[in-house]
Amino acid sequence: MRIALVSDWYYPKIGGVASHMHHLALKLKERGHEVAIVTNNRKTGKEKELEEKEIDIIKIPGVVSPIIEVNVSYSLKSTKELNGFLKAFDVIHSHHAFTPLALKAAKAGRNMNKATLLTTHSISFAHESKLWEALGLTFPVFSKYLRYPHKIIAVSRAARAFIEHFTDTPIEVIPNGVDDKLFTPNWDKEELKAQFGIEGKVVLYVSRMSYRKGPHVLLNAFSKIEDATLIMVGAGELLPFLKAQAKFLGIEDRVKFMGYVESATLPRIFGMADVFVLPSITAEAFEIVILEAMASGLPVVATNVGGIPEIIRESESGLLVPPGNELELRNAIEKLLLDDDLREWLGNNGRKAVEEKYSWDKVVEQIEKTYEEVLSIM
């Protein structure tokens, strides 16, 4: 098959959509398909890797928003250019609903009688009331565009429940994937801790430093926990506040803020951790970072919001707590730090779940099958 993966939200935009598209492209290429990534005209930092893998990258010029770092509009000329590129493909697969390029590609694909799909990665609109108000008048337009795909893929049941408000297009749930060969439990924890200058148990947080991810809640909970180090990986608007918060709580010596970390380094950081924590305040459709922790054999403490309970089975691969509840978060972390057998059991279960359901090989098989099903009705 000749497959175009289309989205404004590709690199250098950091996040789950970009990661998903990139790994999907690589795996589809491995399976013998011709693949191209169609995105905006910013430098992605992935050009060399894609060239080496013989994956084309097609850039469509548009107006880039300085706030969300993606294209927010396209000229008539750019739209015609997009349509011209897409003619060469059998499958048009857009990513991230409610973004201009994805919706334009869905319309173009349907009008050209191509197998047209859209993956929805988010439910965050449902938790931004001001955004609801601002976009209220344009939701009918979005609903119209969401009728163009032959099928919508949702990364979780939570994402499906959200997108169902706007379309009656058939929806299939196919989760995100993780590279289970890159993220593994086969590290020497003590050796890695020594390399990073850390002793004792390690609690790990990897995500954006923003309010909705709950890092401030984690700091408050961790301040009551003794004999452990908290590693916080990620950048974001809350980072200066969090550093001041750690100092105020008197735990700055036990909290290491590592900022943004290159993806090649992340497996080693997961490899030295004992417990992974993601205390999200608001709902997320799907957290790839939880899969990375599970693939690394780590027990996970997370909040029971959005699609997270679909990944973490309570007391089987991790522990779930209510969002914003510092006491229950602290108790869950302490429970794991104090019980070596429980940590190992939960970590092993998480790794097994990844191998059975969430490895990229498993996920791409499902997506490929969906392509074939849509092509069969053309």
Task: List the model feature ranges, each with a label.
Residues 19, 23, 201-224, 237-243, ...:
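A conserved mid-protein helix/loop that constitutes part of the nucleotide-sugar donor-binding site
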Residues 41, 158, 177:
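Carbohydrate-associated surface elements
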Residues 86, 260-261, 268-273:
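Short alpha-helical donor nucleotide-sugar binding micro-motif in glycosyltransferases
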Residues 115, 125-144, 161:
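Nucleotide-sugar donor phosphate/pyrophosphate-binding loop at the beta->alpha transition
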Residues 150, 254, 271-285, 298:
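Acidic donor-binding loop of glycosyltransferase active sites
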Residues 299-302, 312:
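Short hydrophobic beta-strand element within catalytic cores of glycosyltransferases
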Residues 314-315, 319-326, 335-341:
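Conserved acidic donor-binding segment of nucleotide-sugar-dependent glycosyltransferases
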Residues 328, 335, 342-357, 366-369:
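A short, well-ordered alpha-helix in the C-terminal region of glycosyltransferases
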